[in-house]
């Protein structure tokens, strides 16, 4: 399904019959679990079967999954939709003795794509039936009698048996899913795939059209979920092994089958929001100092370099490509954990999880790609990062991609070097002296590694290694910042002309020829000539 990003959820829809799977009938068999109804008989299931199903799906022409929902569901507003809750006594596995339960999301509002959901027990899958009696319709104005018996579900969420109200992972809308770590606060999302993101044309949003939930053993800490994905360009089979914990781990295997050549395929896409922060206050009219789910893109390259790229809310769509081979990991991180920097006691941005992508095997040549989209609205996800293979996927291929996703306060891997803790920018020049020309100041703070010891050593010779793609730099320095037990690098950048062409910046600290910090990358758009101050 191709569409403008801002209209994704409002236009995402699917018809059950389009896949060729059996539609839900008006009758259903009695449930074995409390309150649940099932359809047909259990059928043998494993990941190999699901890959075969995706392969056959890709051989056939794509059929639209668009389906019009009943009028009352189409008319729901946000508050009405939020009031619809799945009943606890109907939760999947509620009658068992395992650690986990699953509950289902109702269709409506933005969520127009019915998905088949199956329960896997002892290697056999059986479809779960939509049942209006399983939902409390709250203040929605709906009742089960108004809705068809074959409506279907929008997605699902996972809970622990000890905490049935707070979910630790949810799959809802297109191929979106998300999870939380020990902070229990949702933030950024992941996707099954990103297709043609940031190309300038319509983006394609694949849909998970079926989920298969495997009943965990009683003593298991892991829930295994399978997903069948479909879109005009590709079909795919996914296996998620989800282990709940302080850092939630998703071990993912995917098998992808293109229908046609894909211009830009995004593997392991992370989707986030950045409106305003310390380094970019272009949209600083809000009363809160900072508004973002994440504040930077971290990368651990195949060559071993650690890179930090602060995020921005640019004046126009910005696309960056970081060429690599066999990357060791990348992700969108929320490094700033200070409540005082956000002052939001409703959504708690300081608790939002980082998301780290770790390939399980060599991914070959390609690039980590970053798309930043202008936004004035914190409800609009305007940041996307993903891996793009150098070779464009071709019809008839099988692409096997395995990776792990880590959701939590910190990623599982971090540089042995010092890391960037803050980036600030503003008007350059020397205080008390008349400016003869326009310049822009950058102050980059580093902490960790050897910096605490070096900051105490008066003989230490720490220098800033700085490169810019255009313009000139001046007033370059690196000095101890005792409050952070680290160092602050500072410099002014003078644009070469009055234009607004972007300037790429690269910076790290070193001593005695040895790097002390990760590499800080930045892309700055100079102010228009009419906005510059001397």
Swiss-Prot record:
Pathway: Glycan metabolism; osmoregulated periplasmic glucan (OPG) biosynthesis
InterPro entries: Gal_mutarotase_sf_dom, GH-type_carb-bd, Glucan_biosyn_MdoD, Glucan_biosyn_MdoG/MdoD, Glucan_biosyn_MdoG_C, Ig-like_fold, Ig_E-set, TAT_signal
Keyword Cell division included in the entry's annotation: no
Alphabetized UniProt keyword annotations: Periplasm, Signal
A GO biological-process term: beta-glucan biosynthetic process
Gene Ontology CC terms, in alphabetical order: outer membrane-bounded periplasmic space
Cellular compartment(s): Periplasm
A GO MF label: carbohydrate binding
Modification note: Predicted to be exported by the Tat system. The position of the signal peptide cleavage has not been experimentally proven.
Keyword S-adenosyl-L-methionine included in the entry's annotation: no
Signal peptide bounds: 1-30
Lineage top rank: taxon: Bacteria
Disulphide connectivity of cysteines: none
SUPFAM superfamilies assigned: E set domains, Galactose mutarotase-like
Gene3D superfamilies: 2.70.98.10, Immunoglobulins (2.60.40.10)
Family that this chain belongs to: Belongs to the OpgD/OpgG family.
Function of the protein: Probably involved in the control of the structural glucose backbone of osmoregulated periplasmic glucans (OPGs).
Record protein name field: Glucans biosynthesis protein D
Organism: Xanthomonas oryzae pv. oryzae (strain KACC10331 / KXO85)
């Amino acid at each position: 399904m191709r569409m403008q990003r801002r209209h994704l959820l409002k236009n995402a829809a699917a018809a059950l019959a389009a896949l060729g799977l059996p539609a839900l009938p008006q009758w259903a068999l009695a449930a074995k679990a409390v309150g649940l109804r099932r359809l047909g008989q259990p059928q043998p299931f494993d990941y190999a079967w699901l890959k075969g199903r995706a392969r056959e799906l890709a051989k056939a022409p794509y059929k639209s999954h668009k389906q019009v929902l009943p009028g009352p569901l189409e008319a729901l507003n946000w508050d009405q939709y939020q009031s619809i809750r799945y009943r606890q006594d109907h939760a999947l596995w509620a009658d068992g003795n395992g650690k986990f339960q699953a509950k289902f999301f109702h269709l409506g509002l933005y969520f127009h794509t019915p998905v088949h959901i199956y329960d896997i027990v002892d290697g056999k899958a059986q479809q779960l039936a939509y049942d209006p009696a399983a939902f409390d319709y709250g203040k929605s104005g709906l009742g089960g009698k108004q809705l068809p018996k074959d409506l279907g579900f929008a997605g699902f969420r996972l809970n622990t048996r000890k905490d049935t109200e707070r979910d630790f992972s949810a799959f809802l809308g297109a191929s979106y899913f998300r999870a939380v770590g020990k902070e229990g606060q949702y933030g950024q999302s992941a996707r099954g795939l990103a297709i043609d993101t940031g190309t300038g044309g319509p983006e394609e949003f694949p849909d998970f059209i079926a989920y298969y939930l495997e009943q965990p053993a009683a003593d298991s800490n892991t829930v295994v979920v399978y997903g069948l994905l479909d879109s005009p360009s590709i079909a795919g089979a996914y296996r998620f092994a989800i282990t709940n914990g302080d850092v939630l781990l998703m071990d993912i295997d995917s098998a992808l089958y293109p229908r046609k050549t894909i211009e830009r395929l995004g593997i392991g896409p992370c989707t986030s929001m950045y409106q305003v922060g310390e380094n970019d206050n272009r949209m600083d009219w809000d009363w809160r100092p900072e508004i973002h789910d994440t504040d930077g893109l971290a990368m651990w390259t195949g060559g071993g370099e650690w890179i930090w790229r602060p995020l921005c809310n640019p004046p126009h769509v910005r696309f960056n490509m970081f060429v690599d081979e066999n990357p060791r990991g990348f992700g969108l991180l929320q490094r700033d954990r200070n409540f005082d920097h956000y002052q939001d006691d409703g959504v708690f941005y300081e608790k939002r999880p980082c998301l780290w992508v770790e390939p399980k095997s060599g991914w070959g040549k390609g690039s980590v790609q970053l798309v930043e989209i202008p936004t004035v609205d914190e409800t609009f996800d305007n940041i996307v990062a993903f891996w793009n293979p150098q070779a464009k996927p071709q019809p008839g291929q099988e692409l096997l991609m395995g990776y792990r996703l880590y959701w939590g306060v910190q990623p599982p891997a971090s540089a042995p070097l010092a890391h960037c803790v803050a980036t600030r920018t503003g008007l350059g020049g020397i205080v008390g002296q008349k400016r003869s020309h326009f310049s822009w100041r950058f102050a980059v703070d580093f902490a960790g590694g050897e910096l605490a010891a070096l900051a105490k050593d008066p003989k230490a010779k720490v220098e800033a290694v700085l490169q810019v793609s255009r313009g000139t730099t001046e007033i370059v320095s690196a000095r101890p910042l005792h409050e952070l037990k680290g160092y602050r690098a500072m410099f002014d950048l003078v644009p070469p002309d009055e234009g607004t062409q972007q300037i790429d910046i690269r910076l790290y600290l070193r001593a005695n020829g040895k790097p002390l910090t990760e590499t800080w990358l930045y892309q700055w758009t100079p102010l228009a000539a009419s906005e510059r101050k001397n």
